[in-house]
Amino acid sequence: VPYCPRCGTPLSAQEVAQGYKLVKEKSAVVRFKVAGEDAYFLAWTTTPWTLPSNVALCVNPNDTYIKVKAVDGYTYYLAEALADKVLSPLLSKEDKEAGKKAYEVLETCKGKDLEYKEYEPLYACAKELADKQGKKGFFVTCDTYVTMSDGTGIVHIAPAFGEDDANVGRNYDLPFVQFVNDKGELTAETPFAGMWVKDADPEVLKDLSGRKQLFDAPKFEHEYPHCWRCDKPLIYYARESWYIKETAVKDDLIRNNNTVNWIPESIGSGRFGNWLENIQDWAISRNRYWGTPLNIWECACGHRECIGSRAELAEKAGDPKAAEVELHRPYIDAVTIKCPECGKDMHRVPEVLDCWFDSGAMPFAQHHYPFENKEVFEQQFPAKFISEAVDQTRGWFHSLMAESTLLFNKAPYENVIVLGHVQDENGQKMSKSKGNAVDPFDALQTYGADAIRWYFYTASAPWIPKRFSGKLVLEGQRKFMGTLWNTYAFFVLYANIDQFDATKYKLEYDKLSVMDRWLLSKLNSAVAGVDDCLSNYKIPEAAKYLQEFVDDMSNWYVRRSRERFWAKGMEQDKINAYMTLYTALVT
């Protein structure tokens, strides 16, 4: 599972997807000595710290591999498609200009032909543990996950670190060697005891170089997952975890997603839809103290029970007080139940739930459903509309959909507006460390909440990233809010002078001037347009209707009707002007 050594807990695939960073670090191309032959497999890895746990190599069974005599004097096995890229750096500039070749091909074969070919273990500690387990290792395996895009076409296998490695390990019944503890430190069996895995990388490279088993250590730029909590690099680490088998309801997830009105549609069919098409089982357990305790009790005999309510807990514990216990650690951990299989005490497993599971339970958990408020829940579920940022396709949008599908087999929401992230005025991600983050409270104090809201309504479609610019906020404030305010101030000024009370009059449409009728027609069109746009979740389009109407009201109606407000007395034409403008403002 993806695992954070700093936090001491596994992460779900959804959490991992939120924390990828582009990193540039040294990889390793290693010489593995072929058993009984003066030749070496050139194998590549981006995680040198896993090499002490190596138990196999892997090739693609369908690709072509070659045995070559290289200009450095060594004989190598590697993929034909990558040989030039890997071996050409052995040539000097002069050799290249002279047309010399970096290697001579001795043999050609398919990857399948190399299967079970043995090599000498890279580290004695791995061989010792493999022997203790009575399992055979240190030979070439085959799997189509090996690609010809990077490296040598041969990868090293450590089943304890990585899903692909683990699959190969199971397929070939390889030894299980895990020389890293749960703190992310290499263990005492290795020459790198106590080192944090990333700190061990250069030491492993140094060690292999000293033994003449390091062919090269090229820098490799790639996306690497980091913990969303602490920002530390994750490792893929074999350990037990509790899962929800989402793969079993994949078709239901996809079908339910297709009933949702996604805005934009491309998120639902693309980013989120693709996520569901490739859904993995959800690792829901966390090795942490704080959180919702996993409601599973386990006996030493292997029997397990999942408790579904306080009443069930009290019944199986044989203690009525258990129904009132605080359902968090450490209190819940003290409650034991009798094992129906052997009669011994069963204890709660130590893990807590992924916090995203809590978020996905929100629609029913907030009402304590199904224990009470059944009618309230059924009236509100599914939600007519929700909105969150685009990263929540792997977060809240997913957890809601997963739990709703498992419990009710329908989508938990009908309409979703996906929001783009707010960036700085140069289009860069806001960061305190970069000094480009805008304090929202300072912005509210400077520009006002309504001006900021209006900026976000009108800047672009909701799903497009927004560049937050104080200048643009002020421009929108001046053009729209300032105009609206000035129109309101104009009305209040003359209404106070004339002591005009709109509640004492009614619009008499047959007595209205052409200008009055024009403004009311514009008003009705704006109301209809805004209502239609908001009903279809078209926010910028709705704002445009408002913006155009305020411009018509101020720069056309008021400017061309001012003399009617200035007139003496309270003639019908003046009343009509007041009532028309009043109606427009309050609507």
Where are these regions (language model features)?
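Residue patterns forming the tRNA-binding/recognition surfaces of aminoacyl-tRNA synthetases
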Residues: V1-P52, T64, D72, Y116-E118, ...
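Conserved oxyanion/phosphate-binding beta-strand-loop segments in alpha/beta enzyme cores
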Residues: K101-Y145, K232-R255, G343-F371
